[in-house]
Design a protein with these regions (language model features):
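Long amphipathic alpha-helical segments
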Residues: 1-92
Length: 93
């Protein structure tokens, strides 16, 4: 199984917010940042590690793709929305 922090970074990169959101189509029905962040907290991952190795790592990936003109503003906005969803769980820490 893929490391949960890597899964969070991948979901942020792809803009996968939660399981019920059908975007992106290839990840339909899979858990998103919302569920994975909660799972990481339940597994006692430090919030700072979830932030740096999960959420920020995913935004760095999408930022690199944007600089290389491989993605466009809508994809970056979906990634930002996904990161914000994860941040909602980390705000209490």
């Amino acid at each position: 199984m893929e490391n949960i922090l890597e899964q969070i970074a991948n979901c942020v990169d792809k803009g996968k917010i939660n399981r019920s959101v059908p975007y992106p189509p290839e990840m339909k029905g899979q858990p998103g940042v919302d569920e994975l962040t909660l799972q990481a907290l339940e597994l006692n991952f430090p919030p700072s590690e979830i932030l740096s190795k999960g959420l920020i790592a995913g935004m760095e990936r999408i930022g690199t793709k944007f600089r290389e003109n491989r993605v466009f503003v809508p994809q970056v906005l979906m990634s930002a929305k996904a990161m914000n969803c994860g941040m909602m769980h980390l705000k209490k820490f």
